[in-house]
Amino acid sequence: YNGDHMSMYAVNCSVPKTLVRYLVLYYAETTENKKLSEVLMDVLDTPVSPELLPPVDGVISQKTEDLVGPYELHDFFLYYMLRFGFPKSKLYRMAKLTFDGVYDDETIKKWLDKFYWRFFSQQFKRSCLPDGPKVGSVAVSPRGDLRMPSDASPTAWI
């Protein structure tokens, strides 16, 4: 939490994690610098971890998506909730159709509930968000995009 806010400028603050992966992959596949391409592909093959812990026997011990759910689901929920104001029930129905064959209904429900809980209970982190560009049509900047109390309770939404 602190490291994200101490950087003073959030260069990727409105770029979804799933899009970052595609951008890195695109650059890795199109650069003429073979060494850079290898490094970028290695980065893409490494699971995202919240801790800078060394791997134990070559295995990362803590993976973010194991804790919070797949980024593609979170980005989907966030986009349609903020951009179009869709309620939780509609997000669930849309996600079931969109991710049919990828995630079962129970998995989507589990991570949708987790998303709502985390989204509303972690608003205090946005209050001290550093400056950064708005890249897409959805952003969570407290200065112009999403105005919401820092102490919002998730119970009303879950």
Identify the meaning behind each predicted range.
Residues 1-158:
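ATP/NTP-dependent adenylation/nucleotidyl-transfer catalytic domains that generate, transfer
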